[in-house]
Amino acid sequence: MTSALFIPELGQLRMILALCFAVVQAVVPLLGAWPGDRLWMSLAQPARWGQFAFLLFAFGCLTYAFMTDDFSVAYVANNSNSALPWYYLFSAVWGAHEGSLLLWALILGGWTFAVSVFSRQLPQVMLARVLAVMGMISIGFLLFLIMTSNPFSRMLPQIPADGHDLNPLLQDIGLIVHPPMLYMGYVGFSVAFAFAIAALLGGRLDAAWARWSRPWTIVAWAFLGIGITLGSWWAYYELGWGGWWFWDPVENASFMPWLVGTALIHSLAVTEKRGVFKSWTVLLAIAAFSLTLLAAFLVRSGVLTSVHAFASDPERGVFILIFLLFVVGGSLTLFVRAPVVKSQVGFNLWSRETLLLGNNLVLVVAASMILLGTLYPLVLDALSGAKLSVGPPYFNALFIPLMGLLMVVMAVGVLVRWKDTPVKWLVGMLAPVLLGSVALAVVAGIAYGDFNWAVLATFLLAAWVLLAGVRDIFDKTRHKGLLKGLPTLTRSYWGMQIAHIGIAVCALGVVLSSQNSAERDLRLAPGESMDLAGYHFIFEGAKHFEGPNFTSDKGTVRVVRNGKEIAVLHPEKRLYTVQSSMMTEAGIDAGFTRDLYVALGEPLGDGAWAVRVHVKPFVRWIWFGGLLTGFGGLLAALDRRYRVKVKSRVREALGMGAAV
């Protein structure tokens, strides 16, 4: 028991030791890479082991403090309570700023560890530089953690008898899965950044670095997309207003690096396969990681008031801003000073290179538009004190047409060839796709019963993407036959097809749920009912229940259609007793083609309640499409050629180690 009293101090010591190892990892291998000293470069390996092990130990210490209700630790006292269920005790470890930053540092250490383990066949000088850059990033976050955000600070000598409890919004499975997935994506872009900076330091921007960094970038992009999808799903059912995206600044902060990351993985493919867009690809790698740091600044600086933002103080914001400026300024300085790279490879207008460049431009313009809409109100407020809100009308008006254009380019890009595509051949490929898309869109519109132009256009674009993929599959298997040819297609190819289908499915969900949702607010007493979109909702009243750390008024709503009961929903109004916070828990009947969503408002006396009812068609397709896209990315990253062909690529690049 006595030894347990020192667990927080052990955790703090491990963070400091991890910082020491990060310094060794950042400095020694980089110094060794300059003259080609193998011994110094090899020290990156034990340094990354030490950093990751000590961060894992520190995270374990903080977890132990939560699980044992150690309220002498300020972070535990502020974000836990003895009545909190054990699974929320565990997720509370990263439920606020300090713990989430420790999780960020741990995941960064994990990415570094993974790169060093799975990249052993790289030239030693390249690997040393990559690990050194990742060590520098770790130094920044660990200094931020230790100096301004120590999760092990004590509340001595006055130890509270109980904690202040975890924010009721976070007492949900969403906290268990959403932040780790999001951070895996955020931090994962540091790998692409590290490879890009290592290539700049080596003075050689060839196709090799693109091949080495591409699978890591795809994995990071997939995790970030899955994290964003889970966050949207969490907000939908937890916040009680029935929405899944509000263009909140913190939502935008996660979406921007995903958009630039999407451009990056396509640009890496061009650089790897054709040796073009080399400088542009490096710039995208820098931008993707810089945007993740911007996201950290927006969430943790206190400049935003958002349901997603951590309450913070200006000191933390200044630290992150300095770190962001250091990373962006330093990397752009290296980029500008790098030798000009001229591609010796040409390509024509109708080529995959051109279409992927168009893909990149659309995605970067979309990200820039979101960046402008997110930062402009903050800059205006800082300079003049004027308050301005940039909301959904701005973002929807600009973003939706860009995404429509992207889906057009996406389908054509799958069918065109590298370097040059005969126009006659391309027309022959696209004509049946276009005709089939129009036919499918009309049939789908008739079956759906809505010829709204937005809905019809979305059906057309989704069919366009789907049929282009099918046409390409038939084209690639035509020599061997479909049954014999399908097994020869690579995981990377299938991952690309699945990800594109996921985008189409998500687009259908977005438009159909937005255009055709029905909503109604009404005062209902027990036994009263309402009708909405062909459904009959009968309110049977609410009963009082006691939870582990809350009290609840749980309603019962029966749903009838065509005289048959199809669902019983139980919306709740919860009072979390420790913080005296009132929360809404929606009652949802999820279906493949629609969600029935009921939320309780305020009690109105005599057993009556304000009741909000939504009927949301195809809303689940949004998250299914997002998860499908992420799965496609992970499948592509598992392609066998990244493991088998890496040896030949390394042999091609071995001259790098001797020349620089």
Swiss-Prot record:
GO terms for molecular function: heme binding; heme transmembrane transporter activity. GO terms for cellular component: plasma membrane. It comes from the Bacteria. GO terms for biological process: cytochrome complex assembly. It is found in: Cell inner membrane. It is a multi-pass membrane protein. It holds the Pfam family Cytochrom_C_asm. Keywords: Cell inner membrane, Cell membrane, Cytochrome c-type biogenesis, Membrane, Transmembrane, Transmembrane helix. The chain crosses the membrane at residues 15-35, 49-69, 99-119, 126-146, 181-201, 216-236, 250-270, 279-299, 318-338, 360-380, 395-415, 426-446, 450-470, 493-513, 618-638. Its main location: membrane. The keyword Cell inner membrane applies. NCBIfam families: nrfE (TIGR00353), PRK10369.1 (NF007691). Belongs to the CcmF/CycK/Ccl1/NrfE/CcsA family. Required for the biogenesis of c-type cytochromes. Possible subunit of a heme lyase. This is Cytochrome c-type biogenesis protein CcmF. It comes from Pseudomonas fluorescens.
